[in-house]
């Protein structure tokens, strides 16, 4: 049974305005938006990315979609740091929860989470489905 559904869209150009260029290691390491949104493993990928703004936009949309699926949004016991997006060996996105997000998922009776992330020239979008 579906216990949560969330979707979000992020404008890549808005993220680009806040993110240093690829290859600017010091700038990327100190990027305030990235430090707020990304977990440590995600941050390492962001810094090494050839398209860091696009990577961050996709993670931002994914985490916002997850927070909506949890029914809390970001800030009511759930932070960006409580949601982590990784990829399986085929490149498909995976989502995991910790802290307040894991607590909220458990309170919903959630046992599985599904995520889809897509991006085009101007936008990144994500959808999260939580199942019991």
Swiss-Prot record:
Family annotation (InterPro entries): 4-PPantetheinyl_Trfase_dom, 4-PPantetheinyl_Trfase_dom_sf, ACPS, Ppantetheine-prot_Trfase_dom
Disulfide bridge positions per record: none
SUPFAM superfamilies registered for this protein in UniProt: 4'-phosphopantetheinyl transferase (SSF56214)
Cofactor field: Mg(2+)
Gene Ontology biological process terms from the UniProt entry: fatty acid biosynthetic process
Positions contributing to Mg(2+) binding: 8, 64
Cellular compartments annotated: Cytoplasm
Entry GO MF terms: holo-[acyl-carrier-protein] synthase activity; magnesium ion binding
Main localisation: cytoplasm
Enzyme Commission identifier(s): 2.7.8.7
Any one of the GO CC terms: cytoplasm
Keywords: Cytoplasm, Fatty acid biosynthesis, Fatty acid metabolism, Lipid biosynthesis, Lipid metabolism, Magnesium, Metal-binding, Transferase
Reactions catalysed, as given in the entry: apo-[ACP] + CoA = holo-[ACP] + adenosine 3',5'-bisphosphate + H(+)
HAMAP family, alphabetized: AcpS
Stored NCBIfam families: acpS, pantethn_trn
Family according to the record: Belongs to the P-Pant transferase superfamily. AcpS family.
Record's function text: Transfers the 4'-phosphopantetheine moiety from coenzyme A to a Ser of acyl-carrier-protein.
Name by which UniProt lists this protein: Holo-[acyl-carrier-protein] synthase
Provenance organism: Shewanella woodyi (strain ATCC 51908 / MS32)
